[in-house]
Every structure is written in C-alpha cells, then in structure tokens.
Amino acid sequence: MPKLKTKSAVKKRFSLTGTGKIKVKVAYKSHLLSNKGTKMKRQARGTFILCDADQRIVKKFMPYG
C-alpha cells in the first residue's frame, strides 16, 4: 500500500495544535486594506480554531496530521 499524500494547500493554510485541533489564520487581511475599518483589521489579526464539522473535512486531507 503506497503512502497517502497530504494536500499541499492544506499543509500551507492549516496547523495542528497540541490537542489535535486545527488552527487557521483569519481572512480579509491580505490586500485592499484602506477600504476596511480599523475594527475589522484588528479582529483579523490572529488565528482561530475551526469548528468540528470543518475539522473533520480538513483532517481527511491530512492523513498523518
């Protein structure tokens, strides 16, 4: 049986926490920032944990994660 491959897009965009949850960078922070409010830019600074339904989908693409 050959090794399963991890999707490159998933590898770049998501990271696993120590407890096995999936962490993601918040969207809307890459370009066209002059049109966006200060509050929106501040809230888009960090990362967040995916919900359980989305975690199940993403984990299918990360067989060894």
From Swiss-Prot:
It comes from the Bacteria. GO terms for biological process: translation. InterPro entries: Ribosomal_bL35, Ribosomal_bL35-like, Ribosomal_bL35_CS, Ribosomal_bL35_sf. Pfam families: Ribosomal_L35p. Signal peptide: none annotated. GO terms for cellular component: cytosolic large ribosomal subunit. GO terms for molecular function: structural constituent of ribosome. Keywords: Ribonucleoprotein, Ribosomal protein. Belongs to the bacterial ribosomal protein bL35 family. This is Large ribosomal subunit protein bL35. The gene is rpmI.
